[in-house]
Amino acid sequence: IRLLCSDWHINYSAKKLKGKVKDKLALQKEFGLPQRKDVPVLAMVSRLTAQKGFQLVVSEMQNLVQFDVQVIVLGTGDANFEHDFRYFADTYPGKVGAAITFDVGLAQRIYAGADMFLMPSAFEPCGLSQMISMRYGTLPIVHQIGGLQDSVQPFNPVTGEGTGFGFHDFSGFYMMQEIQEALRLYSEPAAWTKVVKQAMSQDFSWETASQEYLNMYNELV
């Protein structure tokens, strides 16, 4: 994850975020979307399968595009989902961009240029994408289960703490609630930037994980 954060696709850091706007505008251009730095970009990079929760996304896409947001999808998988996202890109030009392919370089450009990263997985033992997205300053919106629950701290509007957004019940309704919460926070630039910096500052190294397990063991004994 540290290596990804230092690749040439990143032109910014937690202390200096202005370069992320350039990556965003370039990403919008690459997907044929209007180049607007003010509109939030919600991205998904994943296998297009039911295990990854794409049935929720498909069921809510009509609702999602009613908001001032651009949606980008990269991935391959179930033929029905591939068809669905091609259809959405054709039906909602300027709102939805889809690349039904596997492309590591494009995935990195999406991580770097997007504002939000959606992971509504039905189950996820570990998951890396949410950690990568945080390192890129792209806030994850996740179904709080398994590794997603362990690695993403949901935003608390009272304290301002958090590294992303999460919903407990596996349903399109609750997923949309969290997306709307993310959009609301995005409309408050100072508060949004604070959470982005908190997410980028997370340490997912093995050294940190080992120390946390050791501390937990010591507490138990």
Residue ranges and their predicted role:
Residues 1-221:
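Catalytic cores of carbohydrate-active enzymes across secretory and cytosolic contexts
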